[in-house]
Amino acid sequence: MCACAVAGVAVSSLVVPTAESGEMKTKATAPVPQPGPIRKLARKKAKKKFRKSKALAGSGVPGSHPAAVAGRPPKAPENFSQNWKALQELLKQKSQAAEKPLVSQMDDKMHPQIIQQNRKKASDKSKGDKQRTEKAKSTRGSVTSAPTDRKILVPPTDTSGTEQKKGAKKRTYSDISSHQGALKPKWKATEAAVILNQPTPTEEDIWFDDVDPDDIEDAIGPEAAMLVRKRLGQKKRTISLEKEQAFGGLTKALALDCEMVGVGPKGEESIAARVSIVNQYGKCVYDKYVKPTEPVTDYRTAVSGIRPENLKQGEEFEVVKKEVAEMLKGRILVGHALHNDLKVLFLDHPKKKIRDTQKFKPFRSRVKSGRPSLKRLSEKILGIRVQQAEHCSIQDAQAAMRLYVMVKREWESSTANRRAPAATPQHRIKNS
């Protein structure tokens, strides 16, 4: 065993005796792997040798080596498949068809028969087009467009190729639009007629159990409410807040109500903007707007009904306060949530002479509310609707007075019993 280096590559050799001469010969074995770049060079040389041997094998005579024949495309016609032959024939036919020149590009003398046939076809086409246009002209005047046709007809211009008949009237855009308006569908008109011609509800159509006629009037209408009242034997309650022929001066009891506006950064604080007082019969005895003592930040028009122009012509606050205090002195004061009204007027009134409809227990139990609104009390007890949109201080005072008058005897008797002092035992002995 000996080792030699060739071109920087270590190769191991083996001494083998030959059979013929008996001499010892060296036989090269696989190269020993060497570290570093020497190993890379050996790999590159081995690859080059493999590529050269493959190229030499491929460049040989066709058919000499089976691997070379399989790798190259066939050149002899007998080696092609049937599909390939069919594809070649198809491509030849297409190329021949493309090489033929068009008839229109050739001279007329070369193909006279083909040109005559084409001319006949063109003449037949033009005749058919003329016949169609004549039919359209004849039917245009006689046949009217259907109501569902919404296309706007444009009058023919000079550039359009078709000539108008002499004496024919030109159709303008206004004529077309008016004609279309006349042909509009009539479903809207019929629907409106059906709605207007609806019959009034009869007794057979309406049937309610334990429903207030006033609620029926809100939901369906006055006719239905009238039929329900007739069936129940009721009459529509017509309670007036004001007696027409009554005394218009100051009475023993007066009702007060104030409308307020908002002041302050957010308009949360309230000041008086309108003060109204009515007497026992609902007659207005005092009604004045009040000039604001502070800048108004929220007029609350949707609720109060107060507008800036109302306050410009108002009275001074101190004047209103003095006049109201003189009117209420020694009288019964009626109202709803009176503590709010007295607060904005900076007034006080004896508690025994205040009749607040919000605090009257029979009213609260009747409407099942601890703090009922004036709107709810008026609707449930009086059958009158107030405060539907903007509030009116006169109407609110009239409603509060009307509620008080209805239960005046009961209310006054209950307050008298509450004020009467309890009898002491000594007083009972003297009486006995």
Curated annotation (Swiss-Prot):
Xref: CDD domains: REX4_like (cd06144)
Keyword flag Metal-binding: no
Phosphoserine sites (modified residues): S123
SMART domains, per database record: EXOIII
Enzyme class: hydrolase
Subcellular location, principal: nucleus
Entry GO MF terms: 3'-5' exonuclease activity; double-stranded DNA binding; endonuclease activity; single-stranded DNA binding
UniProt feature, compositional bias: Basic and acidic residues: 121-137
Keyword annotations from UniProtKB, A to Z: Exonuclease, Hydrolase, Isopeptide bond, Nuclease, Nucleus, Phosphoprotein, Ubl conjugation
Residues annotated as domain Exonuclease: 230-381
Highest taxon, organism lineage: Eukaryota
Cell location: Nucleus, Nucleolus
Cellular component GO terms held in the UniProt record: nuclear speck; nucleolus
Family indicated by similarity: Belongs to the REXO4 family.
Protein name: RNA exonuclease 4
Species whose genome carries this gene: Mus musculus (Mouse)
